[in-house]
Amino acid sequence: MSLADELLADLEEAGEEDGLYPGGEEGESDGEPGERQVDGGLEDIPEEMEVDYSSTESVTSIAKLRHSKPFAEIMDKISHYVGNQRKNSEVSGPVEADPEYRLIVAANNLTVEIDNELNIIHKFVRDKYSKRFPELESLVPNALDYIRTVKELGNNLEKCKNNETLQQILTNATIMVVSVTASTTQGTMLGDDELQRLEEACDMALELNQSKHRIYEYVESRMSFIAPNLSIIVGASTAAKIMGVAGGLTNLSKMPACNLMLLGAQRRTLSGFSSTSLLPHTGYIYHCDVVQTLPPDLRRKAARLVSAKCTLASRVDSFHESADGKVGYDLKEEIERKFDKWQEPPPVKQVKPLPAPLDGQRKKRGGRRYRKMKERLGLTEIRKHANRMTFAEIEDDAYQEDLGFSLGQLGKSGSGRVRQAQVNDSTKARISKSLQRTLQKQSMTYGGKSTVRDRSSGTSSSVAFTPLQGLEIVNPQAAEKKVAEANQKYFSNMAEFLKVKREKEDKV
């Protein structure tokens, strides 16, 4: 026995011990294998993808809804009521007792069966036509578009070129890809019998789709007659769905809003498939057009609001009040106002000035020790030059491995300008004009400077260069003696009063 067989045997023994197979061994049941039911659970439905219809002869053997008696009766009644319009005043008593209301519920349930039947027919057509054009399944994923394309092409794949009917079904880009793929396909021609069965299946699918749209139009037109206020809020189709699941308008009016929001929720997940795409606690209300128009983060909140308003509208409709839908319009306006309020942008923040910083008590110490400490911890002149950068000049890196680290103005040659401290003219010491003239006279010499008159160094010479004699030694004091002799007549300390002297001479 291999390892896989041993593991399977262990699983079977564990299942028998836990009671997973009640009523006998595995696989034993009273009915067919596909009809077994679990107590308290749902009936096992075989997946549509697991069934192979390639060996099925006719589509009528698997799709029986089109020729069934309930389908024909419902469509006949719809034709009868469409021709005979009724007034709202004709409805009295519980709405569930009205025959047209029961027809609406049955027609709404029939649309679900039509969708399932279309999926079966699509699988049948796909399995049959894969013999002729196997690539078409991946090129046209939509079921109805695929069926219409198969009906149009048939055995002749050249019809996809310049076909006006096909342009109404597919986009131009898809038609181009289909035509290119059809020229290289490896499919084989279909027989006349197979082609006839395909056309029969395509016609049945198109008839069922047309009947479904006819049911939708009828339900939407009559929901305003059965539940006008409810249909105004969520639409006629969604209103018919939630009424059908709830079991009637009276039961719907007795249901709280939290339960109404869960009507139509999908609880079943396929084995082996991810459940992340399934939204929990979401039903028909969540997927209606009113809620889906909002952003995803507001849809759950909107579904709760719409469910509450639908509960109020259903109670009004169950008592045949507000037949003109005034209550429904008021509730819908309230919903739209709240939706607009939720989506409003937040108010603009008011720009406030920053508050004054709370400065603590500063250290105000001074003195010689404090000055010495500041000098010791302060920046040196070398560091100041290293931190100083020249404007509009590219810096050179000091080290190859340290990019961005430069020496600033420390290692650069000077520009010829000496950086001096700025002098404040308002506090600068001033000299009077008379003192300036006195200092200027003291610094003036005739023939140059001498060591006697000036306090300059002794290297100063009294040699003058003249254009007549060339080098000439000049005595700086000679000119001063002449000026002094001229001034002694009036300004000398030894000068006498001339007038008094003359009078003395006259007396003598």
Swiss-Prot record:
Q: Where is this site: Interaction with U4 snRNA and U4atac snRNA?
A: 281, 304, 309
Coiled coil spans: 96-131, 192-226
Renumbered residue ranges of the record's region Disordered: 1-45, 345-368, 442-461
Q: List where in the cell it is found.
A: Nucleus; Nucleus speckle; Nucleus, Cajal body
Q: Which Pfam families match?
A: Nop, Prp31_C
Q: Where is the composition biased (Acidic residues)?
A: 7-32
The organism's superkingdom is given as Eukaryota
Q: Cite the entry's keywords alphabetically.
A: Coiled coil, mRNA processing, mRNA splicing, Nucleus, Ribonucleoprotein, RNA-binding, Spliceosome
GO-annotated biological processes: mRNA splicing, via spliceosome; regulation of alternative mRNA splicing, via spliceosome; retina development in camera-type eye; spliceosomal tri-snRNP complex assembly
Domain named Nop is located at 226-344
Give the residue ranges of motif Nuclear localization signal (NLS): 362-375
Positions of the record's site feature: Interaction with U4atac snRNA: 300
Recorded GO terms, molecular function? U4atac snRNA binding
What coarse category fits the chief subcellular location reported for this protein? nucleus
| Site annotation Interaction with U4 snRNA: residues | 258
Extract one GO cellular component term from the record: precatalytic spliceosome
About its domains, the entry says: Interacts with the snRNP via the Nop domain.
What is the stated purpose of this protein?
Answer: Involved in pre-mRNA splicing as component of the spliceosome. Required for the assembly of the U4/U5/U6 tri-snRNP complex, one of the building blocks of the spliceosome.
Its family remark reads:
Belongs to the PRP31 family.
Subunit: Identified in the spliceosome B complex. Component of the U4/U6-U5 tri-snRNP complex. Component of some MLL1/MLL complex.
Q: What is this protein called?
A: U4/U6 small nuclear ribonucleoprotein Prp31
UniProt source species: Danio rerio
